[in-house]
Amino acid sequence: MVEERKPHINVGTIGHVDHGKTTLTAALTTVLAKRLSGEGNKSVKYDEIDKAPEEKARGITISTAHVEYETENRHYAHVDCPGHADYIKNMITGAAQMDAAILVVSATDGAMPQTREHILLAKQVGVKDIVVWMNKCDVVDDEEMLSLVEMEIRELLSKYGYPGDDIDVVRGSAVKALEEETGSGVWSEKIMELMNALEKISLPTREKDKPFLMSIEDVFSIPGRGTVVTGRIERGVIRVGDKIEIVGLRDIQSTVCTGVEMFHKALDAGEAGDNAGILLRGIKKEDVERGQVLSAPGQIHSYKKFKAEVYILKKEEGGRHTPFFSNYQPQFYVRTTDVTGSIKLPEGVEMVMPGDNISIEVSLDKPVAIDKGLRFAIREGGRTVGSGIITEILE
C-alpha cells in the first residue's frame, strides 16, 4: 500500500529588509503548530531562522532558512533568506525553488526599493503566484493609510506583470500573532487567512508530467548493443521504444530509445529525477557528446542568443577582483557543458562590478539546447564567477 502523499508546494518570503519576512516565517510555523495537527507543523523561532546556515549552490554561498508546515490539503516547504544579497543569489541560482512567494510589505513604509526589486526578480525567474502580507498593521490605526499602501502594492504588482487587482492582500501583524500564545485570537486568524490565500494557488505541474528531457553527461559504446548516453532525467518519462531527438551543438538527430538502465538493471522506463543510461538505436559514439540533450521530438531547440538576469560574484565569494565590460567573453556552463560566449551590457551601463546583478544579452559560439527559465553558471578557467537565468530566447 503506497501512502498517498499530500501535494507539495514551495513558497518563500520576499520583500524589503526589516519589513518582517523572518518574523512572519516564525509566526506561520507557530500558529499552524498550535492550530493544526500534522507532523510537518513544528514551531520555529525567529533566531533559528535568522541564523540560517550557509549553503553552496552552483558555487555560490547563500544563507537560506528552510522550514515546513502543512494544512489538511497540502505540504509546504518555505524558504526565508536573512540578507538582501542572499535573496538575489537564491532567486537567480534557484538554490531554493519557489512556486509561489509571500510578499511582505510593512504598512508603516509601503513599497520600498527592495520590494520592487524582489517583485521584478520573481517575475524574471518564473515565480507564478504571489500573495501579499501587509505587516505591522497593529501600529497603523488610520484605515485610509492602509488602503493607500494596499493600492500602491497592487499597482506595483500589475506593473511587473502580476494580476495586481486579483491578488490576495492580507493585513496582519506577525509580532502580535506570535504574542497570542494559544494560536487563536484576532492576529492568529490573519495568519490563517494568509494560509487560505496560499491554499488557492494552483499546484505546479510536476516535472514528471512534462515532455521528456535529459542532459547528456557521458557517452559509452557497448559492444554488440550500441551507444549508451547517461545523465539525469530533467523532466518527463522515457520508455523503451520512444522516439527521441538529440539536440544541441550539432544538427538535430532522430533516434529511438532501445533500452533504459539504472544501476545496471534494465528497466521499461525512466522518469524525472532518475540517473539513467539510455540506449540509442543506430547512433555511433562519435555522433553524440556531453552537453547535448535527449528530448521528446520537437520539444526543445538549440539557440545561440538569449537575454538573462545574472548575479556576478564578489571577490570574497571567489569571483572576479575587477569589473568587466561589454564584449567580455567567459564560458557559460549550460546544463552539462561549458560554451564560450560574449556578453552585451544594457545601454547606458559601462561596466559590471563584482557583486552586481544585471540583465545582459549573451551570444554563444555554438548553439545549445536552451529554454526560458534555464539556469546556468558563468565561468572563467573552470571557476564560477557568476550565475544566471535565461529570461528570453532571441535566436
From Swiss-Prot:
Identify the EC number(s): 3.6.5.3
Q: Which cellular component appears as one GO term in the record?
A: cytosol
Q: Which InterPro entries match?
A: EF-Tu_GTP-bd, EF-Tu_GTPase, EFTu-like_2, EFTU_2, G_TR_CS, P-loop_NTPase, Small_GTP-bd, T_Tr_GTP-bd_dom
Q: What does this protein do?
A: GTP hydrolase that promotes the GTP-dependent binding of aminoacyl-tRNA to the A-site of ribosomes during protein biosynthesis.
Which keywords describe this protein according to UniProt? Answer: Cytoplasm, Elongation factor, GTP-binding, Hydrolase, Magnesium, Metal-binding, Nucleotide-binding, Protein biosynthesis
Name recorded for this polypeptide: Elongation factor Tu
Q: What class of enzyme is it?
A: hydrolase
The record ties this protein, via Gene3D superfamilies, to: P-loop containing nucleotide triphosphate hydrolases, Translation factors
Positions of Mg(2+) binding: 22
- HAMAP family, per this entry? EF_Tu_B (MF_00118_B)
Catalyzed reactions: GTP + H2O = GDP + phosphate + H(+)
Similarity section:
Belongs to the TRAFAC class translation factor GTPase superfamily. Classic translation factor GTPase family. EF-Tu/EF-1A subfamily.
Species for this entry: Ehrlichia chaffeensis (strain ATCC CRL-10679 / Arkansas)
Q: Subunit details for this protein?
A: Monomer.
GO MF annotation list: GTP binding; GTPase activity; guanosine tetraphosphate binding; translation elongation factor activity
Please give the PROSITE patterns that the UniProt record associates with this protein: G_TR_1 (PS00301), G_TR_2 (PS51722)
Q: Where is this region: G3?
A: 80-83
Q: Which Pfam families match?
A: GTP_EFTU, GTP_EFTU_D2, GTP_EFTU_D3
Q: Where in the cell is it found?
A: Cytoplasm
Taxonomically, what lineage is the organism?
Bacteria, Pseudomonadati, Pseudomonadota, Alphaproteobacteria, Rickettsiales
Which stretches of sequence are listed as region G4?
Answer: 135-138
Q: Where is this region: G1?
A: 15-22
